[in-house]
Amino acid sequence: AHMADGYARASGRHGVCIAQNGPGVTNFVTAIAAAYWAHSPVVFITPETGSMTMGLGGFQETEQLPIFSKITKYQGHVNNPKRMAEITTRCFDRALLEMGPTQLNIPRDYFYGDIECEIPKPIRIGLGAGDEGALDEAAKLLAAAKFPVILSGGGVVMGEGTAAAAKLAELLHAPVAVSYLHNDAFP
């Protein structure tokens, strides 16, 4: 999970990882928390006990969704194999759209076999500076500021705006602080 987070931070693309149910999944906790605070688009796949034995105390069974509920942007649980493509696509879309980790929880028996399904088209958004009105308002605020300070973080990195942030800091003679886990947000 730490490697998936690192890959996502370095590439701006999805980092993906999968664990064994039970102890493998619980080993993801600190890495997924780090990805959450760094706004890394990580999709982590958590195999679950088989669909017919959930809640019966199977080998290494634990309730996996509550463990990650506060450190994910979205949690998808496949409750029917026919929804596999839909929920998988949703996890990948939400990881990028909301910039953070998503959990794809799949009962173990759904990993096998063939299904007929339509694969949804991924949602893509362009990262940009904002609309003209927002930019005008930001320029007015900066022009009126006596001691502007820049906080540069994950949004700057993912929007490939590090060089622009450096230029702005030079233009304004403004000090720059970086957000937690984003020392890469300013040169």
PLM-predicted stretches and their roles:
Residues A1-P187:
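N-terminal alpha/beta PP-like core and its mobile active-site loop of ThDP/TPP-dependent enzymes
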